[in-house]
A protein has these predicted regions:
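Short structured motifs
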Residues: 19-24, 81-86, 190-194, 252-258, ...
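Structured core of small recognition/catalytic domains
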Residues: 178-260
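Non-catalytic linker/capping segments at the edges of enzyme domains
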Residues: 1-42, 140-211
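HotDog/MaoC-like acyl-thioester-processing domains
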Residues: 65, 77, 90-93, 103-168, ...
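Residue-level preference for beta-strand/loop junctions
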Residues: 17, 29-31, 76-78, 94, ...
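Hydrophobic beta-strand-centered segment that forms part of the acyl-chain substrate-binding groove
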Residues: 64-97, 235-268
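Intrinsic-disorder/low-complexity, polar/charged segments enriched in Ser/Thr/Lys/Arg/Asp/Glu/Gln
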Residues: 32-34, 81, 95-97, 113, ...
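Hot-dog-fold acyl-thioester-processing enzymes
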Residues: 9, 20, 32-66, 211-235
């Protein structure tokens, strides 16, 4: 199947979240997917930049979908781990094209591996993806709603921070001002309604509430939304290290999906901490936990400071 939209794609790729994020199918065959997403102001962080989290749903859907298209009908598979190693910076506007290929499938063991790439419209490499999927037997409690083809309303994006808001500040002051609402948190954090609550040098805490639009067919939050939250948090932790005029960029992210948060569950707390900071590279660990303190997601990232 080749398509410029999701109308002819498998149901798993026609869910409301893919439609909301503008993810569309370019090519589909068993074990292989090519998807695309337009990027721009809707998905920018507070700096007005496209980051990995801007295409988190795409990053999850592409390798995950390649595995899903490889298993027998009626078999469910979700990602348990996803890693992304970034090359060139994500484009501020334009298109990001992701390809995913199932590289190993062992139904007896109940798992599979997939790899993929992300490129811009000119073919420039943006990221290399690796993922592990596991077979699940949970009922698809929200499938009828999520896969109905309903198009959710696209919210108006929140503003980015102004140039004057960022100029002349060390990064810690920027993140402090973001937490207090003195500067805008940006469209991507606004989409999640991510509320930064605590800020120290090398440490940031925040929370967000699960929302219905985040659901996958199983009734839990789609992994790409969790990628977005973790990437935003890791970036903010990196920014607390920056001097006036210094920039940061996440270079890689490895995320383990430990437990599946329900879309009707309690608020999720997110914490990111720098575990080592050199002159040019910082190593960051982040966790998403539920109200009882159980780990939902753990992630590790490296950031470049320049």
């Amino acid at each position: 199947v080749t398509s410029t939209d999701l109308d002819s794609a498998p149901p798993e790729l026609r869910d409301r979240l893919n439609l909301l994020m503008g993810v569309r199918a370019r090519a589909i065959r068993p074990g292989h997917l090519e998807l695309a997403q337009d990027v721009g102001a809707r998905f920018h962080d507070h700096r007005g930049q496209t980051i990995l989290g801007s295409v988190g749903v795409l990053a999850d859907a592409c390798p995950g979908g390649s595995l899903g298209s490889s298993v027998p009908e009626g078999t469910g598979m979700v990602l348990s781990q996803l890693s992304a190693t970034l090359a060139a910076p994500m484009p501020a506007t334009g298109v990001v094209v992701a390809t995913g290929d199932a590289t190993h499938l062992d139904l007896d063991a109940g798992m599979g591996l997939a790899s993929g790439t992300m490129r811009d419209g000119a073919g420039t490499p943006l990221a290399v993806l690796q993922s592990r999927g596991i077979v699940v037997t949970r009922p698809r409690a929200s499938a009828d709603t999520v896969l109905s083809g309903e198009r959710l309303p696209i919210p108006d994006p929140e503003p980015c921070a102004g140039v004057d808001d960022l100029a002349g500040r060390i990064g810690l002051d920027v993140v402090d001002a973001l937490a207090s609402g003195q500067i805008a948190r940006g469209p991507l954090a606004g989409l999640l309604d991510l509320q930064v609550t605590d800020v120290e040098r090398g440490s940031v805490a925040a929370s967000f509430a699960p929302q219905d639009w985040m659901s996958n067919p199983l009734g839990s939050i789609q992994g790409g939304v969790l990628v977005t939250a973790a990437d935003l948090m890791n970036g903010l932790a990196a920014q607390t290290l920056t001097a006036t005029g210094q920039q940061y960029r996440i270079l890689d992210l490895r995320i383990d999906f430990v437990r599946s948060p329900a879309v009707d569950g309690p608020d999720i707390r997110a914490v990111a901490e720098v575990v080592r900071a050199g002159r040019r590279i910082a190593l960051i660990e982040s966790h998403l936990v539920d109200a009882s303190g159980q780990t939902l997601v753990r992630a590790a990232a490296s950031a470049r400071l320049s």
